[in-house]
Amino acid sequence: MTLSFTTRWRDELPATWTALNPTPLHNARLIWHNAELAHELAIPQSLFADNKGAGVWGGEALLPGMSPLAQVYSGHQFGVWAGQLGDGRGILLGEQLLADGTTMDWHLKGAGLTPYSRMGDGRAVLRSTIRESLASEAMHYLGIPGTRSLAIVTSDTPVYRETTETGAMLMRLAQSHMRFGHFEHFYYRRDIEKVQLLADFAIRHYWPHLQEEQDKYAIWFRDVVARTASLIAGWQTVGFAHGVMNTDNMSIMGLTLDYGPFGFLDDYNPQFICNHSDHQGRYSFDNQPAVALWNLQRLAQTLSPFIAVNALNDALDSYKQVLLAVYGKRMRQKLGFYTEQNNDNDLLNELFALMAREGSDYTRTFRMLSQTEQNSASSPLRDEFIDRAAFDSWFSRYRARIQTEQVTDDERQLQMKSVNPAVVLRNWLAQRAINDAQKGDMEELHRLHDVLRNPFNDRDDDYSRRPPEWGKRLEVSCSS
């Protein structure tokens, strides 16, 4: 089957991009590809047959119909206007036309210098490329919307960061790479025509059912708010911290975008900061919902020339309601509650307080809670707590709550295990795969990808256990 690509962004959004080809790496080699995703998108396996990576994965060739470009956008970084940014190391190769009429961006990250590289070299390192690849697939299989990873290429090209590292490329796929920052770029240049052109493009291609609506812009923005709220609720339920929630890293589609110094909670700490450059804790785990709303307010400002202020405010006011509704539903599922009762939030908050006091492992706590039997006062989770009396007090009230549901233990346990993963991408697991890959051994990279495809399966091994002490102390920066 021949792949078909369109050039909609290039054709319909002039002055938002610069045309250029990728700069190949030296001696590029394909080290991993996503066979399942390739099958879903009808991408021929023959494209991955050349183990030396001499092809589209390493920026050495283009497929018919591709017309590569780098996009320009701006943004607020750590709450401060940063001005022009743009694709500093990534190139949009093309938009694949899918059988259902939708498209999928092919975005090559680490593709070399662009006009938007600023002081950078346009490259990505193997370390960050592996992290993003693992994270995007882990989040997908946890049910959280985001970009996908199709292939990783390594090379003999040295890249200079804090130390000399290995140059790499990642083929990243997404329904769209349109960011809040695209709108900000033209708004702050007083080019409102381009802002509206971006909105028209989004509605025409991603919200086509709104095209004939009289208030299409207001309805569209309200859905962007809802998608963002739902995304953040998903992050909070799986214990994911993004680390760099700048407006240029926010997707209008409600996708997790740009995996940098992210982290999943190990010990439950609501003030968890995964980015060691975030000295003020702006992007701490507990602050993510508020930051997302702040970012939406910045987007709303760019749309104010053609959406009424009251409509923008109404949409922004709906954020909290959607966030709490989605978060509440997911947390009730994690607790095994089929109905909503008045004291559910109190029960959850009391558990969180106990976990924070004890430093309980976030993922393991909810997974082990999935084994609860409503008529048994014993629980394997009890051994995870030092203050047994406090746990017993909470657990007795929890058992009383699940006894109000007309559900068998087997049914509830099965349901809870379907939403409480046994495995998440802990930093130490990613680092172990990276360490091996940097030595030329890709076995753990492939194995970890396979494990992350089935996060809800029962297992009792390194992937589901608490991290070792050294694994808890890993610091991650924005360097990539």
From Swiss-Prot:
Keywords: ATP-binding, Magnesium, Manganese, Metal-binding, Nucleotide-binding, Nucleotidyltransferase, Transferase. It catalyses: L-seryl-[protein] + ATP = 3-O-(5'-adenylyl)-L-seryl-[protein] + diphosphate; L-threonyl-[protein] + ATP = 3-O-(5'-adenylyl)-L-threonyl-[protein] + diphosphate; L-tyrosyl-[protein] + ATP = O-(5'-adenylyl)-L-tyrosyl-[protein] + diphosphate; L-histidyl-[protein] + UTP = N(tele)-(5'-uridylyl)-L-histidyl-[protein] + diphosphate. It holds the Pfam family SelO. Its cofactor is Mg(2+); Mn(2+). InterPro entries: adnlytase_SelO (IPR054838), SelO (IPR003846). Mg(2+) binds at N249, D258. Its EC number is 2.7.7.-, 2.7.7.108. It comes from the Bacteria. PANTHER family: PROTEIN ADENYLYLTRANSFERASE SELO, MITOCHONDRIAL. This is Protein nucleotidyltransferase YdiU. The gene is ydiU.
